[in-house]
UniProtKB/Swiss-Prot annotation:
The lineage of its organism: Bacteria, Pseudomonadati, Pseudomonadota, Gammaproteobacteria, Pasteurellales. Its EC number is 3.1.13.-. Belongs to the RNase T family. Mg(2+) 1 binds at D26. Pfam families: RNase_T (PF00929). Binds two Mg(2+) per subunit. The active form of the enzyme binds two Mg(2+) ions in its active site. The first Mg(2+) forms only one salt bridge with the protein. The gene is rnt. GO terms for molecular function: 3'-5' exonuclease activity; magnesium ion binding; nucleic acid binding; RNA exonuclease activity, producing 5'-phosphomonoesters. It comes from Haemophilus influenzae (strain PittEE). The record marks F32, F80, F127, F149 as: Important for substrate binding and specificity. This is Ribonuclease T.
Length: 229
């Protein structure tokens, strides 16, 4: 008997989000236009589910990125995120290397979890998704694992659960420590967003909100039918 057969249906990651593999993303940029402004930093964290159905952060990657040729650089954006694009200690790589490394990590995790496609999880997710997709298009990297427009927005989810939409306030509501001095570092924000998303998913489970009673009945009926066959 395989591991997936031994673990209850709703305690398998592939069955939690309809076959989607959730990946936490955060980007730091030189503006708001994903087509024209530079992508300067990117971090991602994949998730795993334990045998009891609880979600946890798993693998991570982090890249400082060189502005693509002809990219706009908004000085106000650099002042906001504190990035010095001319600092050689950044260790910046090309967009091609960053997106290639990101997709390789995600495809491995997606395969291991037996999921069919990946989905971006981010705080104000439309922003992060637009920059990742624009970079993927510019670089021509094949086999983009992400759904082209679907996403999970932790700002919306936190607004529903806590009445808070700002990342730091949502984290504090979930009793997740947040160091404001490290905010707007892509890796730090991704780590906190991953903790927040896992907390919300796990808390819903603890409250009895997932699986829903209708899903439990449906799963049991499916299992009975398979046994009968």
């Amino acid at each position: 008997m395989s591991d997936s057969q031994e673990i209850p249906y709703h305690n398998q990651l592939k069955n939690r989000f309809r076959g989607y593999f959730p990946v936490i993303i955060d980007v730091e940029t030189a503006g708001f236009d994903a087509k024209k402004d530079a992508l300067l930093e990117l971090a991602a964290i994949t998730l795993k589910m334990d045998e009891n159905g609880y979600l946890h952060p798993d693998q991570k990657c982090h890249f400082h990125i060189e502005p693509f040729e002809g990219a706009n650089i908004n000085p106000e954006s650099l002042k906001f995120n504190g990035i010095d694009i001319h600092n050689p200690l950044r260790g910046a790589v090309s967009e091609l290397d960053a997106i290639t490394g990101l997709f390789q990590m995600i495809r491995r995790g997606q395969k291991d979890a037996d999921c069919q496609r990946s989905i971006i999880v981010a705080h104000n997710a439309a922003f992060d998704q637009s920059f990742v997709m624009a970079a993927a298009e510019r670089t021509g990297v094949k086999r983009n694992p992400f759904h082209p427009f679907g996403m999970f927005d932790t700002a919306s989810l936190a607004g529903l659960m806590f009445g808070q939409t700002v990342l730091v306030k949502a984290c504090l509501a979930a009793k997740i420590p947040f160091d404001g001095k490290q905010a707007h570092s892509a890796l730090y924000d991704t780590e906190r967003t991953a903790e927040l998303f896992c907390y919300m998913v796990n808390h819903l489970k603890d409250l009895g909100g997932f699986p829903h009673i209708s899903q439990i009945d449906e799963t049991e009926n499916t299992a009975e039918n398979q046994t009968a066959l």
